Each structure stands twice: as structure tokens, then as C-alpha cells.
């Protein structure tokens, strides 16, 4: 696929490289301290998502996982979904190696809100699983994953959870000198060649940021055939292309510039970022997606302002997203999503012991799909929401051993269709979803704590759930929405028990969510041609968006234990998750639900050397929906080795071995599980540096 390796926006990347060089080569801008003291260059950790008061993950009522630092560096993959897919409670849509969104507790698409620095991503990834998320993990510094309903703070589209990708493109801390990191990677099953440079510089008052990255891959090596033997037996699909996933090559590049005025108690900053991604759609051997995103961000936050209002935070992003789907070298369907999203949050001082925040969020996006395969009309979505979140410490056994939380939110959402020949006349729907949540965290002693959360959540239907009407080639379906949908309503309960003692820790959680009118895409048993005509010989299975009663019930657990200290340290890690999702109206299972997974790992470090072994077993999934094939079990075995080089600048070489058993791994959460397995046995090497 030589066309994938064609550069599309070289001038923009050149400008970014020049900006990086300028930042590094002009020390007079930062004359106060041209050589940075390494002790002063450590960036303060960003508070985790899902709590406006800045509580740490151990202090959260809802379960939150934070991936950052070296752990994130060794977990990075080409997509956000694949970077997170082994976390407890998290899987991925896995539409080949180039497009993969996180799935949280069996929920995906609109119910998992993907954010960048606390502001939503405007792209097309929730519309179709073959559309990549407009973020590259190479430049991310931290990822917060909120598992479970987060509609209170982020709106109904966060009813399944939140993934917040955090970078430092707008510097938030005072910086005196220059700091940065760089990374290169080679190899892997997709013959990857990638690299990234991230630089920050400042003089105590003014700080700038620059980053650039690029990734090239070829078609991915796979164990055996792309088509599963089960699908071959079921419908006679021929088993071709042994050892290679055809049309899975890619090329991505981009970068950003940012600048801030930083003060003792806050900052004001602006950034621009550009992202280009050109990749093969593995569901069709002759289709390429050429994607680009331009985004401007403005952010400010000031703390310690006074007794009544002690904190103010404002963020807004303007996004211009577009992609074109190219078949046999000819542009066919074009997609665009342009709009603004932002929030204003005000934290108040203690009222007695009560602390909290009120906030206002807004979004205005215009989406268009033009071409023969456009299955949604041009549309506009506008939302406005206000929320309040409060915490109150209390005493149950000991002083302040109990923390209570309470919050509520109201939104106004307008979803307008512009109509069209296929979609009928223009139509407007408006919704007023409301959400409320109450939780508690009880510290039994220094080691043990328990927490629980009750929530009632409402979500407005998305534009494609309302207005879809056309062939969706990526899923092989003719999809039809329903303009009469009501607000989606659910109630949930979530509970965790946590233990931490020295170098040992574990968490166990359970949850149950009950939907009174879950919106899902269900087969109608008919076959269609691309014009929407019922045809038993048609290639598209009919699928309608419907509202049904549904339940999601699951368990999650993870732990880390220091089992040896002496000549080095050896840690044992354990993890597991399970979710069961049912359509209560039909008495059937819901589609694409991950099976029970059990995992363990060993991590050893000694002086400059480190190594790890990770094993994850996914059980056979037989609890399947109508017209869905079961998925066989698998065992994924990966290993990592690192070596910190004896240099004055921190340089670390690393090697990652994937799928050491060369097992045929198929994710049940993927639409393509029976035609696109995970990578085969492979080795990736790289070098990472920090200064």
C-alpha cells in the first residue's frame, strides 16, 4: 500500500520541527536559568479525572485507574484502545491495528467519553469502529480511566466511563530551564518505525511547549489465517492471506505548539495541535482512510483565591476534524466534525466542612458525511449543562474516617438533522437529561477502606441513533435509527474494597447497572442491498437501533505484591475482570461483551536492569447475541526488558516481545474478530531518553 506512505501535510510538520529547534537553540529567552536543575524540572502530577477537588485515586469514591510515567511508556501502543485494553474492566473495539476505542465494562461508542485534557474529542470514532480516535499515544503523558458512570461531571455520554488523555501542551507549572523527552521504536508485528520528541522550556513566568511525532507501519503479521475456522465453517468464507493482515499498514504524524503565562497560583495558556493519520481499513482490502485534525485549546486555572471562591478553571477547544475514505485510489465518502467544547468550573471554600464545585459545560458540533456510503445526514448537536459536586468529611469510628459525596447535573441537548433524499425532511429533537449520584468512602484503618456509589443517569440519544439510515460498510449492515427515541435511563450501584500495606496492594470491585431503555443496534433478520431494498441475496444485514431493558453486572480485581527484596526487587501482579450483559426484553445476551479474563505478571528490577513477564488468559465466550459467533479462548504472553544506559542523560533501551506463544487471539469485543486477529509473535525494540 504505497499510497499510505505518501506525506500529506509536510509543511505543517516542518514548521513544528523548526519551532522545536527554535525553543532549544535560543537560550536567551530563558536566561534566568539556561541549564535546568533536574530537581526543579519534575512536573507536578495532574490530579486524576472524576473529582473536581483534586483527590488522589485512593481517595476516590468511583474506581479510577491512572497510567503515567514509565508504566505508560512501556504500555504505549499505536491506538488508545490497545494501550488500555489489558486494564481490569477495559477492553477495546480492535478494528485492526489502526482503529481501536476503549470499551469500559461492556459499554462503548457514545457511552465512553474520550477527552483530551478534560475537553471532549470531536472526531468520528464513536460513529463507526473503523474511524480512529484523533489522539496519538506517543505524546500522552498520563491517562486517567474512570470505570463506571461519570455522567455527573461529564454528561450522559460518560454513562459507561471516561478516558482522559493528558498532555502538557499547555504548560501549567512554573518552569525555569529546558526539559524534554524523546523516544524511537522499531519492529513489532507491523514493522513499526516511530518516534516522538517532547520539549518544554520556561523562564519562571513564560513557558512554551513543542512536540512532534511520526509513525509508519506495514501490514501486520498474524498467526495463521485472517479468517477464523469458525467463520469458514459457518458461512464458507475462504481462509486466505496466511500470516498477514492485508491492508493494515498506516502512517501517522503530527505535533503541537503551546505557551503559557505561569504564576504561583495558576496559569493562562494556549496551544495548537495537528494530527494526520492515513491507514488501511482491514475490513476492505482496497479502502484507505485519510484523517486529519486541527485543534486549538485555551485553558486557565487559578487556585487559592479566597474563602468564598477558592478556585476557577476554564477550558475550551476548537476542533476541525475531517477524513476521506478512498477506494481503489478514488475519494468516495467524506466526513467532517467541526465545533467547540468547553467548561467553566468554580470551586468554593469550606462551608463548615463542606467543600465542592459548581460547573457549566457546553458543546456545539456540526457533523457531515457526504458520499454514496454516508449513512447519517448532516447534523448539529448542541448541549449545555450545569452540575454541582460536594464532599463532606464525617466521623463514624475515628475522626474524619468517612467521606460523603453528592452531586447532580442537568443538561439541555438539541440534536438537529438537516435531512436529505435518504433521510427525509429536516428534523429537530431536544432532550433534558438529569443525573444524580451519591457515594461514600470509609477508611476502616490505615490499610483497609471500602467505598460505594449510587447513581441515576440519563443520556440523550446521539445523532446516529436517531437519524441513521443507510449502508454501513465497515460493519456489513444496513443501519436504521429511530427519531422517536426517549432519553436513555439507567441506575447503577458500584462498590469496592481496597487494601494497601507497604509495597502490597489490591482492589476488588463489583457493579450492577440497570437500563430501563438501553439503546442498542440489533439485527432485524433481513438482508439488504446498498440502496436499502430488501434482498435475500443482499450483502448487508439489516440492523435497527432499538430501546430495550438491559442489565450489566460485573467484577474487577487487581493487586500488586512484593514477593522478594535482596539482589533486586520482584513483584507479582494479579488482575481479573468479568461482565455479563443481557437484553431483558428478549432474554438474550448483548453483543460484543468481553469474556472472563485472568492475568498475572512478574516484574523484576535490579540496578539498571529490569524485566517483566505478563500473562493474560481470555476464556471462551459462548454467551453470545443472535447472529453472533462464539469466540475461542486465548492466552497472551508478553515480556519486556529494559536497560538504563550509564550516561549523564537518562537513556533507557527497551525490548518488548509480544504473543510469545504465537496464539490466535481474537477479541470478542471486535466487529472484526473473525477476520482480523491480534498480532503474532514479534519483537519491538526502542530507545527512550529524558533530560
Listing of model-derived features with the role each one plays in the protein:
Residues 247-248, 339-346, 387, 482-486, ...:
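Outer membrane beta-barrel strand-and-loop segments of large Gram-negative receptors
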Residues 180-183, 187-190, 194-291:
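Periplasmic-side early beta-strands and strand-to-turn transitions of outer-membrane beta-barrels
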Residues 261, 271, 376-515, 573, ...:
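Structural signature of Gram-negative outer-membrane beta-barrels, strongest in the C-terminal barrel
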Residues 354-356, 395-398, 404, 511-515, ...:
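Gram-negative outer-membrane beta-barrel transporters
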Residues 223, 514-517, 521, 620-623, ...:
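C-terminal beta-signal and adjacent terminal beta-strands/loops
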Residues 248-252, 265-312, 317-339, 372-380, ...:
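Flexible loop and strand-edge segments within Gram-negative outer membrane beta-barrel domains
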Residues 42-75, 101, 109, 119:
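N-terminal periplasmic "start-of-domain" segments of outer-membrane beta-barrel proteins
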Residues 120-147:
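Short acidic/polar hinge/loop motifs at secondary-structure boundaries
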Amino acid at each position: 500500500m504505497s499510497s499510505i506512505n505518501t506525506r500529506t501535510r509536510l509543511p505543517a510538520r516542518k514548521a513544528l520541527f523548526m519551532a522545536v529547534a527554535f525553543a532549544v537553540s535560543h537560550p536567551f529567552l530563558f536566561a534566568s536559568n539556561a541549564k535546568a536543575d533536574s530537581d526543579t524540572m519534575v512536573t507536578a502530577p495532574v490530579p486524576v479525572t472524576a473529582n473536581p477537588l483534586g483527590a488522589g485515586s485512593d481517595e476516590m469514591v468511583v474506581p479510577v485507574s491512572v497510567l503515567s510515567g514509565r508504566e505508560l511508556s512501556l504500555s504505549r501502543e499505536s491506538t488508545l484502545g490497545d494501550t488500555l485494553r489489558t486494564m481490569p474492566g477495559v477492553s477495546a473495539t480492535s478494528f485492526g491495528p489502526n482503529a481501536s476505542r476503549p470499551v469500559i465494562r461492556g459499554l462503548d461508542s457514545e457511552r465512553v467519553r474520550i477527552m483530551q485534557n478534560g475537553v471532549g474529542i470531536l472526531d468520528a470514532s464513536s460513529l463507526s469502529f473503523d474511524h480512529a480516535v484523533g489522539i496519538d499515544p506517543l505524546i500522552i503523558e498520563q491517562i486517567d480511566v474512570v470505570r463506571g458512570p461519570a455522567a455527573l461531571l461529564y454528561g450522559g455520554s460518560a454513562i459507561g466511563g471516561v478516558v482522559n488523555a493528558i498532555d502538557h501542551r499547555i504548560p501549567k507549572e512554573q518552569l525555569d530551564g529546558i526539559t524534554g523527552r524523546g523516544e524511537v521504536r522499531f519492529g513489532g508485528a507491523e514493522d513499526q518505525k516511530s518516534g516522538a520528541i517532547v520539549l518544554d522550556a520556561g523562564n519562571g513566568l513564560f513557558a512554551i511547549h513543542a512536540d512532534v511525532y511520526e509513525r509508519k507501519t506495514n501490514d501486520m503479521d498474524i498467526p495463521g489465517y485472517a479468517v477464523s475456522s469458525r467463520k469458514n465453517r459457518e458461512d464458507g468464507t475462504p481462509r486466505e492471506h496466511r500470516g498477514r493482515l492485508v491492508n493494515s499498514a498506516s502512517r501517522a504524524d503530527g505535533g503541537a505548539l503551546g505557551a503559557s503565562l505561569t504564576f504561583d497560583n495558576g496559569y493562562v495558556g494556549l496551544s495548537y495541535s495537528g494530527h494526520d493519520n492515513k491507514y488501511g481499513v482491514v475490513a476492505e482490502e482496497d479502502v484507505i482512510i485519510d484523517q486529519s485534525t486541527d485543534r486549538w485549546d485555551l485553558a486557565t486555572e487559578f487556585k487559592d483565591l479566597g474563602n468564598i471562591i477558592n478556585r476557577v478553571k476554564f477550558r475550551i477547544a476548537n476542533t476541525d476534524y475531517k477524513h476521506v475514505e478512498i477506494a481503489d485510489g478514488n475519494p468516495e465518502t467524506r466526513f467532517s466534525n467541526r465545533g467547540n467544547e468547553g467548561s467553566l468550573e468554580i470551586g468554593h471554600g469550606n462551608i463548615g466542612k463542606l467543600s465542592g464545585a459548581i460547573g457549566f459545560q457546553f458543546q456545539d458540533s456540526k457533523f457531515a458525511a457526504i458520499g454514496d456510503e454516508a449513512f447519517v445526514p448532516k447534523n448539529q448537536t448542541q448541549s449545555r449543562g450545569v452540575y454541582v459536586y460536594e464532599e463532606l468529611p464525617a466521623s463514624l469510628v475515628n475522626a474524619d474516617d468517612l467521606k460523603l459525596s453528592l452531586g447532580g447535573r442537568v443538561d439541555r441537548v438539541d440534536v438537529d438533522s438537516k435531512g436529505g433524499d435518504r433521510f427525509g425532511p429536516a428534523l429537530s429533537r431536544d432532550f433534558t437529561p438529569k443525573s444524580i449520584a451519591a457515594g461514600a468512602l470509609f477508611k476502616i484503618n490505615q490499610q483497609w477502606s471500602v467505598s460505594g456509589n449510587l447513581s441515576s443517569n440519563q443520556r440523550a440519544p446521539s445523532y446516529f441513533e436517531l437519524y441513521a439510515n443507510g449502508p454501513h460498510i465497515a460493519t456489513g449492515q444496513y443501519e436504521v435509527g429511530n427519531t422517536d427515541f426517549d432519553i436513555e435511563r439507567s441506575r447503577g450501584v458500584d462498590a469496592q474494597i481496597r487494601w494497601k500495606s507497604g509495597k502490597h496492594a489490591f482492589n476488588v470491585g463489583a457493579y450492577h447497572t440497570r437500563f430501563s431503555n438501553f439503546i442498542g443496534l440489533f439485527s432485524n433478520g433481513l438482508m439488504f442491498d446498498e440502496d436499502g431494498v430488501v434482498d435475500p441475496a443482499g450483502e448487508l444485514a439489516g440492523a435497527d437501533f432499538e430501546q430495550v431493558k438491559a442489565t450489566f453486572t460485573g467484577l474487577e480485581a487487581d493487586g500488586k505484591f512484593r514477593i522478594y527484596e535482596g539482589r533486586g526487587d520482584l513483584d507479582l501482579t494479579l488482575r481479573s475482570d468479568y461482565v455479563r450483559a443481557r437484553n431483558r426484553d428478549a432474554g438474550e445476551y448483548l453483543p460484543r461483551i468481553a469474556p472472563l479474563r485472568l492475568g498475572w505478571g512478574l516484574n523484576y528490577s535490579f540496578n539498571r536492569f529490569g524485566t517483566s513477564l505478563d500473562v493474560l488468559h481470555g476464556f471462551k465466550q459462548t454467551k453470545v447475541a443472535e447472529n453472533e459467533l462464539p469466540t475461542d479462548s486465548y492466552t497472551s504472553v508478553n515480556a519486556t526488558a529494559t536497560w538504563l544506559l550509564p550516561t549523564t542523560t537518562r537513556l533507557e533501551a527497551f525490548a518488548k516481545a509480544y504473543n510469545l506463544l504465537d496464539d490466535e487471539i481474537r477479541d470478542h469485543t471486535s466487529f472484526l474478530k473473525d477476520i482480523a486477529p491480534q498480532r503474532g509473535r514479534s519483537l519491538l525494540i526502542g530507545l527512550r531518553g529524558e533530560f
